[in-house]
Amino acid sequence: MEIILGVVMFTLIVLALTVMILFAKSKLVNTGDITVEINEDEDKSFTAPAGDKLLNMLSSHGIFVSSACGGGGSCGQCRVTIKEGGGDILPTELSHISKREAKEGCRLACQVNVKQNLKIELPEEIFGVKKWTCEVISNDNKATFIKELKLKIPDGDVVPFRAGGFIQIEAEPHTVKYADFDVPTEYRGDWDKFNLFRFESVVTEPTVRAYSMANYPEEHGIILLNVRIATPPPSVPDAPPGIMSSYIWSLKPGDKVVISGPFGEFFAKDTDAEMVFIGGGAGMAPMRSHIFDQLKRLHSKRKISFWYGARSRREMFYEEDFDQLQAENDNFRWHVALSDPQPEDNWTGYTGFIHNVLLENYLKDHPAPEDCEFYMCGPPMMNAAVIKMLKDLGVEDENIMLDDFGG
C-alpha cells in the first residue's frame, strides 16, 4: 500500500509541475504571431509566428542579412538595430558589440530570439540582397590547397556587386569524401605527404558561409571564388575538416549551388591616394577584384602596387593576368615574395615574408607611407604582421582596409 501511495504522490507531483510549467510558458512566451516593423516602413514589415531567431525570420521573408558563420554568433556580421522589443543583449553578443553600440540598440540578428513585437532598423542596401541558384562552370586547382570555383548566374540576372564584395553560399546536409577529390598530379605531393585523402566531412544541417568574389563587376554572368581547403591542423589531426570548403571542393561542373548577396564593406575609397594591395593565399580573391576594377573598368590613374606572398612557385596563380595588367598600365606594378622557394622554381625574385619584403624594398624609402591606402587580405598571421608594420610607419587606421576572412 505504501508503495502504491508513493507512486500516486510522485505522479501527482509530476503532473502539478507540468501544469505549472505549461501555465508559465503560456504567460511568458508569446506563441502567437508577432509583427516585425522595419525602418518604420509598412511595406517592409511583416507578421510571423513568435519563437524563431530574428536572422531566420528575416531570411524567410526574403531579407538576407550577412552572416558569414551561418548564424553561429561567431562572425559578428548580422548586425541590426533594435528600437523596441529585443530584450536584453546576450553575453555571446558582447564580444562583437561595444557598450556604446549596445546602448544604441545594436544586436546580432542570429542571437535575438523573437518573443514579442519588434521595431528594427536595417541599412537600405540589405533590401537589394537576393538569392540565386547557380550552375558550376568549373572548379579547378590554382594552387595545392586553393581551387577557383566559377559559377554561372541564371540567364538575364545580374549580381549588382562592388569590387571587394562577397556572397554567401548555402549547403544542404551532405557527406564529402576527400578520396573523391580530383587533385592534379602537380599538387598531390603534399596531399599524399600529409595523408589528407583520408578525411571525410559529414554535415547534418544546412550551412552558410561567406566568400569574397575574385571577379570584378564587368565580368558579367559569373561569380568567381578562390577557396582554400580547411584541413585539420597537424597539431589536431582528428579535428573535423572545414564544412563549407570541403563541400565546395567536391563540386563538379553542372552542379547547382545556391548563393545570396551581394554583401560587403571592403570597398575602395574614391580618392587619388596611392593604393597598396597586400595579399596571401586565398586572400588573392578580393585583390584581383579590386585591381581589375581599378584598371579595367575605372581606368584609374592612381599609383597602384600589389604585393603577394606565396610559399613556392607552385602556389602562384593569375600570374599571366597581372603580368598583362602591368604591361598595359604604367601606374601598376606587382611583386611576389616566396617564403619557401623550391630548387626547381629557379626563383630569382623576392624571398621571405611579404610584410618584410614590402618594408625593405618599398615602404622604408617611401616619402610618405602614411598617405597611402593599404588594402589587405590573407591569413591571420600575415594580416597581423602587416598591420603592426604599418602602425610602426605611422599609418592611421583610416588608411588600413582589411578583408579579415580568417579572423
UniProtKB/Swiss-Prot annotation:
2Fe-2S ferredoxin-type domain: residues covered: 32-126
Positions with a binding annotation for [2Fe-2S] cluster: C69, C75, C78, C110
Sequence ranges assigned to domain FAD-binding FR-type in this UniProt record: 129-269
Main location, first listed in the record: membrane
Membrane topology: Single-pass membrane protein
EC number: 7.2.1.1
GO cellular component, one term: plasma membrane
Record bears the keyword 4Fe-4S: no
GO MF, one annotated term: metal ion binding
Compartments reported by the entry: Cell inner membrane
Co-factor(s): [2Fe-2S] cluster; FAD
Keywords: 2Fe-2S, Cell inner membrane, Cell membrane, FAD, Flavoprotein, Ion transport, Iron, Iron-sulfur, Membrane, Metal-binding, NAD, Sodium, Sodium transport, Translocase, Transmembrane, Transmembrane helix, Transport, Ubiquinone
Catalyzed reactions: a ubiquinone + n Na(+)(in) + NADH + H(+) = a ubiquinol + n Na(+)(out) + NAD(+)
Cofactor binding note of this UniProt entry: Binds 1 [2Fe-2S] cluster.
Pfam families: FAD_binding_6, Fer2, NAD_binding_1
Organism domain of life: Bacteria
Residues passing through the membrane, by range: 3-23
GO biological process: sodium ion transport
Matches recorded under InterPro entries: 2Fe-2S_ferredoxin-like_sf, 2Fe-2S_ferredoxin-type, Beta-grasp_dom_sf, Cbr1-like_FAD-bd_dom, FAD-bd_FR_type, Flavoprot_Pyr_Nucl_cyt_Rdtase, FNR_nucleotide-bd, NqrF
Family per similarity comment: Belongs to the NqrF family.
Function according to Swiss-Prot or TrEMBL: NQR complex catalyzes the reduction of ubiquinone-1 to ubiquinol by two successive reactions, coupled with the transport of Na(+) ions from the cytoplasm to the periplasm. The first step is catalyzed by NqrF, which accepts electrons from NADH and reduces ubiquinone-1 to ubisemiquinone by a one-electron transfer pathway.
Subunit and interaction comment: Composed of six subunits; NqrA, NqrB, NqrC, NqrD, NqrE and NqrF.
Alphabetical list of PANTHER family matching this protein: NA(+)-TRANSLOCATING NADH-QUINONE REDUCTASE SUBUNIT, NAD(P)H-FLAVIN REDUCTASE
Protein name listed in UniProt: Na(+)-translocating NADH-quinone reductase subunit F
Lineage: Bacteria, Pseudomonadati, Pseudomonadota, Gammaproteobacteria, Enterobacterales
Gene designation: nqrF
